[in-house]
Amino acid sequence: MKKIVFTGGGTVGHVTLNLLLMPKFIEDGWEVHYIGDKRGIEHQEILKSGLDVTFHSIATGKLRRYFSWQNMLDVFKVGWGIVQSLFIMLRLRPQTLFSKGGFVSVPPVIAARVSGVPVFIHESDLSMGLANKIAYKFATKMYSTFEQASSLSKVEHVGAVTKVSDQKNPEPDELVDIQTHFNPKLPTVLFVGGSAGARVFNQLVTDHKKELTERYNIINLTGDSSLNELSQNLFRVDYVTDLYQPLMELADIVVTRGGANTIFELLAIAKLHVIVPLGREASRGDQIENAAYFVKKGYAEDLQESDLTLDSLEEKLSHLLSHKEDYQAKMKASKELKSLADFYQLLKKDLS
């Protein structure tokens, strides 16, 4: 039986594509393994998925671009992670390794290269993350969402692979209940921010609940179960799975962070959106670059977190609603998307 090892973690964005690809390989008779951190979100997501995947936990350290005494300890953690990954590779003898990035992916990538296993990487952002910059040196091939410099000879630009499906499924009963609390005459605004990125949106909705629900139907994906609420013109929930796409479709506008996975999902369904990227104090600035790219293309509006107020947000919402046809036309004309089926076929071809 053919074997494939996946790696990637630290954030949902470093796991999502893996979760989409793994069922495809399982259906085609592959034995699927995953290398990550048992304390990381990658382990949680795989357990939640119920997929027939063998998880291997390794030591991992954070890769920092700045001086920290913690770097000294983390060098040893990464080194031990490489040794652990090497033993896993030599024991499994997989046909390939697929990496979605994140700090935990570096040891398996290095170990795969050392043990002669082909390495395929996916980069979602406009600028490469530090983990993928290191991993690129050991890669057989890298697939990118955005076009990269021509000097990166191992990169193939494939566009975004999104988890939003074109298939229309029956509306969940819960969605019907939500809609009975909404005013059909008001625009519906969905706030989605990922695990840590949702906090600023949660605070905005909490602070201005009255004003917001007078003018809009509000959906707030909070990541915090203590905020769960369904009331007039307001639905707040910590986490959704089957409801994710129906809520996207229900919304007239989405207010989101600048992670590549989410904004390309919005592009795929031509959904109006305001991007509030994580600032450089909380990230390496990749979300700011992603947001600027989308604004330049005419797909979205952006708003820096430091400038986020009720008034500034409403100005962006009003502008998008007033120019809805222009934004949607540009999104529908985009050539920057690839279906999961097409990407899977491309990956299988490269593996053969």
Curated annotation (Swiss-Prot):
It is a peripheral membrane protein. It is found in: Cell membrane. InterPro entries: GlcNAc_MurG, Glyco_trans_28_C, GlycoTrans_28_N. Its main location: membrane. Its EC number is 2.4.1.227. It catalyses: Mur2Ac(oyl-L-Ala-gamma-D-Glu-L-Lys-D-Ala-D-Ala)-di-trans,octa-cis-undecaprenyl diphosphate + UDP-N-acetyl-alpha-D-glucosamine = beta-D-GlcNAc-(1->4)-Mur2Ac(oyl-L-Ala-gamma-D-Glu-L-Lys-D-Ala-D-Ala)-di-trans,octa-cis-undecaprenyl diphosphate + UDP + H(+). Pathway: Cell wall biogenesis; peptidoglycan biosynthesis. The keyword Membrane applies. GO terms for cellular component: plasma membrane. One of its GO terms (biological process) is peptidoglycan biosynthetic process. It is an enzyme of class 2 (transferase). UDP-N-acetyl-alpha-D-glucosamine binds at residues 195, 287. Keywords: Cell cycle, Cell division, Cell membrane, Cell shape, Cell wall biogenesis/degradation, Glycosyltransferase, Membrane, Peptidoglycan synthesis, Transferase. PANTHER family: UDP-N-ACETYLGLUCOSAMINE--N-ACETYLMURAMYL-(PENTAPEPTIDE) PYROPHOSPHORYL-UNDECAPRENOL N-ACETYLGLUCOSAMINE TRANSFERASE, UDP-N-ACETYLGLUCOSAMINE--N-ACETYLMURAMYL-(PENTAPEPTIDE) PYROPHOSPHORYL-UNDECAPRENOL N-ACETYLGLUCOSAMINE TRANSFERASE 1. Cell wall formation. Catalyzes the transfer of a GlcNAc subunit on undecaprenyl-pyrophosphoryl-MurNAc-pentapeptide (lipid intermediate I) to form undecaprenyl-pyrophosphoryl-MurNAc-(pentapeptide)GlcNAc (lipid intermediate II). Belongs to the glycosyltransferase 28 family. MurG subfamily. This is UDP-N-acetylglucosamine--N-acetylmuramyl-(pentapeptide) pyrophosphoryl-undecaprenol N-acetylglucosamine transferase. It comes from Streptococcus pneumoniae (strain CGSP14).
